[in-house]
Amino acid sequence: MEYLSLLTGRPVPDRVESWRDASIDQIVAYIDGVKPAATPALDRRLHEAIQRFGVPVSAKEFATIERFHAAFVDAGLSLRFHSFGRPPQGYYPTYRELLLETDQKGRTRSYLASEGDFQFVRSLEGRDAVIPVVGDLSGTHALTAMGRWMTEHNERLSAFYVSNVENYLFRDDGFERYMENLNRLPHTDRSAIIRSIFGRFGLPDSVPGYYSTSTVQNLNELLANFSAGKYQTYSDLLGR
């Protein structure tokens, strides 16, 4: 409750500890029912929180952070993805919809679905275990550096979320280099690739009314099939 209130600029409720066992539906209803605080107060609180980290932040960087936070404050839980040069499409989910989404068994699965789920993700952040890596999946640096670090620390890949980037890699003739990069990552027989499939590439088992489908594939299976020449197009990869 406290996290989502601060993220959207809403006042944290009194006796916030009493919300510890609240459902995500109850938390969302609270956020939707209150107005955000005044912008100057939010900016002061944001600056104070960032300064406590002890990391030097320039005025330009503060302005960028304020702009990002303002998007969450202004739109609240109705915030949705925007791409450059065009308004959001009607099938883009809102933040509210993502928080309330359930799997096919009716279970909510966001990291805010329960206090335990949130604390697990929070503990990763607290240990600096969430590390952004910016790079080209078919390039020569990002995945190579990750593989080197994993080897040095005796780590093995559990899961790799690739979204729908493989579609673009096929278009740009980068899929083979991407396969080579994946093969360099230390992995096990249980390592998995998670992908999102959109629009016209939807699968027979896609849920009606949804624009995207998530699938899981064993990494060793992916690499073996590629070596056998089974993936010449993106549709081949999706099994269509």
Which residues make up each language-model segment?
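Class I S-adenosyl-L-methionine-dependent methyltransferase module
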Residues: 1-131, 204-210, 219-240
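Extracytoplasmic/secreted proteins, especially bacterial periplasmic and envelope-associated proteins
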Residues: 26, 41, 141, 145, ...
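Adenosine-cofactor binding site in Rossmann-like domains, unifying the SAM/SAH pocket
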Residues: 120, 128-151
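Short amphipathic alpha-helical segments and helix-helix/interface helices
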Residues: 122, 147, 179-183
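Extracytoplasmic/secreted cell-surface and envelope-processing proteins
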Residues: 142, 169-171, 202-205
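C-terminal soluble interaction/assembly domains
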Residues: 152, 156, 161-199
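Extended, Lys/Glu/Leu-rich amphipathic alpha-helical scaffolds
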Residues: 188-216
